[in-house]
Amino acid sequence: MLKHCALALALFAAPAWADEAVPRGTVAFLGLYLMNNEGDADDSDERARVAMARDQIARDLAARGFTLVDTSPVAEKLAQIKNIASCNGCDMALARDLGADYSVTGEIQKTSELILALNLFLRDVDARANLRHGAVDIRGNTDESWSRGYRYLLNNIIFRGEPKP
């Protein structure tokens, strides 16, 4: 009998442990930073993939019901920041200046043509805190591997438990 009560309690309590959906609001998507540890002189392929990933993330956020704000009013400040994903909260200050509820930033770490790490941060501007953060390692430096990596990161880590767009 005690086993059945414990099992029933665990089943009813399980939803409390699940991630809650992120409340929808306005997002300042401030970009992705490419950290190329391989030291390639020509990183034009990666720059094109950063642009592709930026578009993919923006489309995903919009499809999930977030409203992306225009970041052009802070473009000059943004251009002076080396790594927007790691700037001691400057992304949240910029997002606040834009009137956004959240900031979204990311970082790509290229170790070699085979090994890359994708990081994405969703931060609550009012709370001045990380709301969600995810990282995935991908194998292969191709458009397809980057796209799959970000799709996995968004669907299974950042918005885990929420419907896929």
Residue ranges and their predicted role:
Residues 64-105:
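Short, solvent-exposed, polar/charged sequence segments at loop or secondary-structure edges
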Residues 39-41, 81-82, 116:
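Short, well-ordered secondary-structure micro-motifs
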Residues 1-8:
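Sec-dependent signal peptide recognition
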Residues 13-18:
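N-terminal signal peptide c-region/cleavage motif recognized by signal peptidases
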Residues 40-52:
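Glycine- and acidic-residue-enriched helix-capping/strand-helix junction motifs
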Residues 40, 73-74, 132:
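Generic signal for short, ordered secondary-structure residues
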Residues 19-37, 53-56, 60-67, 93-97, ...:
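C-terminal/domain-edge helix-coil "capping" segments
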